[in-house]
C-alpha cells in the first residue's frame, strides 16, 4: 500500500518513470544511428536547428538529438552512454539535479543535454569548481566539434577579446568564480563592446552542491585598495591578546561570535585612554577591536588559514584547498596578519559584489549533477526550484558501510585509526583517510611516520600534486590522507589485485557537520560496482559532538567506565551523531535562507543600477533620459520644502532659488518675483524650462555625437561612484542591523526599509550630480569615459585596484550636498 502511495505522490518516482519512457525511445534509435556515415550523423545538427527555427521545441527533437549525441560520443571517445546516463541526461535537460554515484560518468552524461540545448544558439555553460576540471572536461569538446558546434574554455588569464570569443561559442566550459566575476566586470565597463557575456541562457553545474550550497554564503567581490593605518590593527591585537575568556570576553561556541564583557570594555578604555569606548567618534576603533577578537579567538591557524611565505592564505573550508590571493573582508584579514606578526596588507573597498545564489538564478534554466544532493533537496527546491533525481547505478553498489566507532576522546580515536591503517596496509589494501582539518592530517601523518608506514598527505599545503596523489590512491599498499575530500571530481581507480583485497578502504577521522560531505567521502570507495569498505571514527571531543552532541550519553558512558581506548559500535549512538548533523544542516540552511533574504534587497537594487548602466551603454543617445533627470532633481529640491505641508512658505521660495541659481542656471536665472506664491508644480515647471534653455544654448554648436558621448561619460562616472559608496553603506547597515532585534524590531524588515531609503537617497544624489555636472561642466571634444577603478583585478588576486577618491570640501554657504536646496550651514552643517 505504501509503495503504491509513493508512486502516486512521489515526484522523483514519476519523473524517473517519464524519463524511462523517453530513454526507451532513444535506445530504440541506437541501431539506426550506428548505420549512418559520419557526415550524415553530423548533418543532423543543421536539420535540428532548422526545425527549431520553424517552430518546433526542444522536446520535439529531444529523442533524436540524444540518440545522435550518444552515437557521436561512441565514435569520438569509444564510450556510449549507458541507459542510466540517458536518465541522468534527461533529468539535467529538464532543469533538475541528477544525483549520480562516483564513477557513474557524470561528464559523459552532461554531453547529451548540452548538445540538445546548444541547438538553440543561445549558449550553454558547463560549470565546474576549478580550472583543472574545466580544462579536463573541455577535452570532451571533440564530440561537439564532430557535430558542428563550437566550444569555448573560459580561463582567468584570457583577454576580454578571447573571453568574448569563448562566450560566443555554442558551449562554454568555465568555473563558477570566473562566470560571476565576468558578470560583475561586464557591469563596470564603460563601452558596450567591452562586455564578454551574452544573456544567461542554460547552465549545467557540476558538483552542484559544492557551488550552490557550500559556497552560497561566500559573495564574489571585486575590490579596490583603501589605506588604513597598520598601527591600529597592531594596537588592537596587542590589547585583545591581553584579555581573559569569560572575564574580558565571551565566545558562543555554536556561532563562533566573540564579544567584550563590561570588564573588557573598561580595560579597552584604559588601554586606549578613552572616556567611553562606545562614543560615536570611536566606531573605527570598536570595529578594529571586534575584528581582532574574531582573528584571535574564532579563527584558527591551519584550519581557517595558513601562513605561507610570510602571508596569510585562506583555506577553503569545503575543499581544503588554499585560496591564494583571496582576502577576508572588512579588515579581518589585516587583523589576522597582526595576530600572526606578518606584514599587514592594504585593506580593500568593495566595488561590485554578487552571491552565487543570485547569479545562477539569473539563468533561464539551471540544472546540476553531483554524487550527493538528496540531503539538501529542500534547499535546492526552495531557492533554485530544482528537484533532486537519484539516478540508478549501472551496477549495484556492494560497498560495506560500517557503523561508526565511538571513542571517549581524540587520543584513543587516533590510536585506533592508526591501528586500523596498519592492519589493512599489512594486507596491501589501499586506505584513504578523510580529515576535516589540516592539523589532523598532519598529526596522523606524524603517527604513521613513527610506524614507518609510507603514505601521501593531500591538503591545502600541497594541492599542486593533487591529481598525481589521487591517481595512485587506489593502488595496492597506498595510504592517502586527504583533508575535506580534496581531489573531488577525480575518480580513484583500483589498481591490479586490489578488488581481491576488498577494494578501497575509506576511514573518516570524524564526522563532518554535513551528512552530504560524509557521503562524498564514502563515495570514493565502491565505484562502478567495485568492492569497498568505509568506517567513521568519532569521539565525544570532536567539534560536532562538543557543539551539538548529547551530554546525557556522554555522562552515562563515563559512569559505566567508558574511558581511554575503549570503543562502542552501536546504531543508537550513530543516530545521535546524525541527529547532531541534522541540527547543523538545518541551522546552516536557515542561515543561507536568511542571508538570501538580505541579499535579495541588494540584488533588487543592483538590477536597477545595472539596468540604468545598460540603458546608457546600449542606446545611441540618452538625451531624453538626461532631461528627465533634470526635472527629477528640480522636483527633489522643491519637494524637500514640502515635508510639513503641501504649500511653500515665503522663505522656501528664496532657498529654492538660491539652490537652483547656484547649481543649475547660468544665463536664465530666476528672480524671486517670478515664483513667489506659485504652486510647487508651477515652480518646478518654470525652473525646468529655464534649465532647458540654458542647456540647449550650451549645446547649440555641439554635434549630437559629441553631446551624446559627453552625457554618457558624465552619467556613468556619477552612477559608478555612488554605487561603490552605496555598497559600502549597505554593508555597514547590515553589520549593525542585528541589534534591532533587541528593540523588538525585525532586523530584516528594518534592513529592507532603511536599505530602500538609502537607495532612494542615492538615486536622488545621482540625478543631482549628473544635472549639475552637465549644466556647469565645459563640453570637450573626445571626452574619455573612465572607470571609477580598475576592474581586471579581483579579490582573488594579491594586488588590488586603486579607488579614485574625490575629495570635496563643502563651504558653509554652499548648497547642502543632501540635495535639500538649503545652505549647508542651515541644513546638515548645523
Where are these regions (language model features)?
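Short, Lys/Glu-rich amphipathic helical modules
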Residues: 427-441, 619, 645, 672-676, ...
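Extended, charged helical/alpha-beta scaffold domains that provide interaction surfaces
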Residues: 306-313, 319-326, 528-529, 541-809, ...
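Hydrophobic, well-ordered secondary-structure elements that form the walls
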Residues: 433, 481, 723, 759, ...
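A short, cysteine/histidine-rich metal-binding "knuckle" motif
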Residues: 810-814, 819-830
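Conserved P-loop NTPase motor core
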Residues: 1-561, 610-611
Amino acid at each position: 500500500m505504501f509503495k503504491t502511495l509513493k508512486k502516486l505522490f512521489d515526484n522523483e518516482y514519476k519523473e524517473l518513470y517519464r524519463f524511462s519512457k523517453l530513454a526507451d525511445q532513444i535506445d530504440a534509435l541506437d541501431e539506426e544511428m550506428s548505420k549512418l556515415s559520419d557526415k550524415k550523423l553530423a548533418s543532423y545538427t543543421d536539420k535540428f536547428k532548422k526545425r527549431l527555427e520553424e517552430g518546433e521545441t526542444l522536446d520535439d527533437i529531444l529523442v533524436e538529438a540524444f540518440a545522435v549525441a550518444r552515437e557521436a560520443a561512441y565514435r569520438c571517445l569509444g564510450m556510449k552512454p549507458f541507459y542510466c546516463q540517458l536518465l541522468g541526461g534527461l533529468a539535467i535537460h529538464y532543469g533538475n539535479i541528477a544525483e549520480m554515484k562516483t564513477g557513474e560518468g557524470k561528464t559523459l552524461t552532461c554531453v547529451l543535454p548540452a548538445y540538445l540545448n546548444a541547438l538553440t544558439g543561445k549558449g550553454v555553460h558547463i560549470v565546474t569548481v576549478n580550472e583543472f576540471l574545466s580544462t579536463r572536461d573541455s577535452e570532451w569538446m571533440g564530440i561537439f566539434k564532430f557535430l558542428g558546434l563550437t566550444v569555448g574554455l573560459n580561463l582567468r588569464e584570457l583577454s576580454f577579446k578571447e573571453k568574448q570569443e569563448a562566450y560566443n561559442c555554442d558551449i562554454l566550459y568555465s568555473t563558477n568564480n570566473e562566470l560571476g566575476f565576468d558578470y560583475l566586470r561586464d557591469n563596470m565597463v564603460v563601452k558596450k563592446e567591452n562586455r564578454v557575456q551574452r544573456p544567461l541562457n542554460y547552465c549545467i553545474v557540476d558538483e552542484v552542491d559544492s557551488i550552490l550550497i557550500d559556497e552560497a554564503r561566500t559573495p564574489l567581490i571585486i575590490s579596490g585598495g583603501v589605506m588604513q593605518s597598520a598601527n591600529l590593527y597592531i594596537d588592537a591585537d596587542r590589547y585583545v591578546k591581553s584579555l581573559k575568556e569569560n572575564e574580558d570576553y565571551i565566545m558562543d561556541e555554536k556561532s563562533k561570535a566573540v564579544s567584550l564583557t563590561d570588564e573588557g570594555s573598561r580595560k579597552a578604555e584604559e588601554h586606549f585612554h578613552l572616556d567611553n569606548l562606545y562614543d560615536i567618534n570611536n566606531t573605527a576603533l570598536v570595529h578594529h577591536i571586534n575584528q581582532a577578537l574574531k582573528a584571535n579567538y574564532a579563527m584558527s591557524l591551519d584550519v581557517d588559514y595558513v601562513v605561507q611565505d610570510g602571508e596569510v592564505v585562506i583555506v577553503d573550508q569545503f575543499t581544503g584547498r588554499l585560496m591564494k590571493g583571496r582576502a577576508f573582508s572588512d579588515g579581518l584579514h589585516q587583523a589576522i596578519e597582526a595576530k600572526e606578526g606578518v606584514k599587514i596588507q592594504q585593506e580593500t573597498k568593495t566595488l561590485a559584489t554578487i552571491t552565487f545564489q543570485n547569479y545562477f538564478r539569473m539563468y533561464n534554466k539551471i540544472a546540476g549533477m553531483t554524487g550527493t544532493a538528496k540531503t539538501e533537496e529542500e534547499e535546492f527546491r526552495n531557492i533554485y526550484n530544482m528537484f533532486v533525481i537519484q539516478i540508478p547505478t549501472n551496477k549495484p553498489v556492494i560497498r560495506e558501510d560500517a557503523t561508526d566507532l565511538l571513542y571517549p576522546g581524540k587520543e584513543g580515536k587516533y590510536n585506533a585509526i592508526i591501528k586500523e591503517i596498519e592492519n589493512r596496509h599489512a594486507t596491501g589494501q589501499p586506505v584513504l583517510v578523510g580529515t576535516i582539518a589540516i592539523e589532523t592530517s598532519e598529526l596522523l601523518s606524524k603517527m604513521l611516520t613513527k610506524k614507518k608506514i609510507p603514505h601521501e598527505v593531500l591538503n591545502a599545503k600541497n594541492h599542486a600534486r593533487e591529481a598525481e596523489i589521487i591517481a595512485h590512491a587506489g593502488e595496492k599498499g597506498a595510504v592517502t590522507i586527504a583533508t575535506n575530500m580534496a581531489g573531488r571530481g577525480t575518480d580513484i581507480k583500483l589498481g591490479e589485485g586490489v578488488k581481491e583485497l576488498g577494494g578501497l578502504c575509506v576511514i573518516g577521522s570524524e564526522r563532518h557537520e554535513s551528512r552530504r560531505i560524509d557521503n562524498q567521502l564514502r563515495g570514493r570507495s565502491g565505484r562502478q560496482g567495485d568492492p569497498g569498505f568505509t568506517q567513521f571514527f568519532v569521539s565525544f571531543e570532536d567539534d560536532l559532538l562538543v557543539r551539538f552532541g548529547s551530554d546525557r550519553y556522554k555522562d552515562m558512558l563515563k559512569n559505566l567506565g567508558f574511558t581511554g581506548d575503549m570503543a562502542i559500535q552501536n546504531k543508537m549512538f550513530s543516530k545521535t551523531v546524525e541527529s547532531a548533523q541534522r541540527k547543523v544542516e538545518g541551522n546552516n540552511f536557515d542561515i543561507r535562507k536568511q542571508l538570501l533574504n538580505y541579499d535579495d534587497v541588494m540584488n533588487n537594487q543592483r538590477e536597477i543600477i545595472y539596468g540604468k548602466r545598460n540603458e546608457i551603454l546600449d542606446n545611441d543617445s540618452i538625451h531624453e533620459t538626461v532631461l528627465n533627470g533634470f526635472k527629477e532633481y528640480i522636483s527633489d529640491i522643491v519637494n524637500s520644502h514640502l515635508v510639513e505641508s503641501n504649500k511653500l512658505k515665503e522663505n522656501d521660495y528664496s532657498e529654492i532659488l538660491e539652490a537652483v541659481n547656484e547649481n543649475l542656471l547660468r544665463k536664465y536665472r530666476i528672480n524671486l518675483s517670478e515664483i513667489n506664491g506659485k504652486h510647487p508644480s508651477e515652480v518646478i515647471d518654470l525652473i525646468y524650462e529655464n534649465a532647458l534653455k540654458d542647456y540647449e544654448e550650451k549645446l547649440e554648436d555641439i554635434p549630437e555625437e559629441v553631446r551624446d558621448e559627453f552625457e554618457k561619460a558624465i552619467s556613468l562616472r556619477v552612477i559608478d561612484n555612488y554605487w561603490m559608496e552605496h555598497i559600502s553603506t549597505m554593508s555597514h547597515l547590515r553589520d549593525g542591523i542585528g541589534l534591532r532585534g533587541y528593540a523588538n524590531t525585525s532586523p530584516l524588515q528594518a534592513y529592507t526599509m532603511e536599505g530602500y531609503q538609502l537607495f532612494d537617497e542615492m538615486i536622488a544624489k545621482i540625478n543631482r550630480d549628473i544635472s549639475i555636472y552637465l549644466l556647469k561642466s565645459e563640453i570637450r571634444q573626445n571626452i574619455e569615459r573612465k572607470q571609477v577603478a580598475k576592474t581586471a583585478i579581483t579579490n582573488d588576486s594579491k594586488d588590488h585596484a586603486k579607488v579614485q577618491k574625490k575629495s570635496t570640501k563643502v563651504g558653509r554657504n554652499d548648497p547642502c550636498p543632501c540635495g535639500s536646496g538649503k545652505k549647508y550651514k542651515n541644513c546638515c552643517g548645523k
